[in-house]
């Protein structure tokens, strides 16, 4: 379907606005993926705060100009599905990674974070805010328990030396 100039400008503005508010972006090739699977991917994306859009390559290149994701311009070749993470930097990458496990035809092209192309696998493994807090609390808890054990052992050693 042919788009007129106004439609193209609207698409570029919409994607540019999404890119400006996003924390990270992931680009994938969705050729060969069933429509039902893509519908479920879009539903999961909405639930996880990920903006998904299939955009023509020229429009996608224009949309990312002047954003942190300008480094992705060379990736827009062939059918491209772009996902912008709005709430957590790893949300889109994690969503695409899980979807790719179920759909062998779905493949990553690239991912960007803070103005640089990064490995999508690394981006997908970033902990969420709650996971990071839980890990920090676990480390703090282990450190204090370890300190207590070392203190008790030192007191025991002192008492043994005094008795000897």
Curated annotation (Swiss-Prot):
InterPro entries (alphabetical): Ribosomal_uL10, Ribosomal_uL10-like_sf, Ribosomal_uL10_bac, Ribosomal_uL10_bac_type
MF annotations from Gene Ontology: large ribosomal subunit rRNA binding
One GO biological process term: translation
GO CC terms of this entry: ribonucleoprotein complex; ribosome
Xref: SUPFAM superfamilies: Ribosomal protein L10-like (SSF160369)
Pfam families per UniProt: Ribosomal_L10
Cysteine pairs bridged by disulfides in the record: none
Keywords linked to the UniProt accession: Ribonucleoprotein, Ribosomal protein, RNA-binding, rRNA-binding
Known role: Forms part of the ribosomal stalk, playing a central role in the interaction of the ribosome with GTP-bound translation factors.
Record-stated family: Belongs to the universal ribosomal protein uL10 family.
Subunit structure, interactors included: Part of the ribosomal stalk of the 50S ribosomal subunit. The N-terminus interacts with L11 and the large rRNA to form the base of the stalk. The C-terminus forms an elongated spine to which L12 dimers bind in a sequential fashion forming a multimeric L10(L12)X complex.
Protein name (Swiss-Prot/TrEMBL): Large ribosomal subunit protein uL10
Gene name of this polypeptide: rplJ
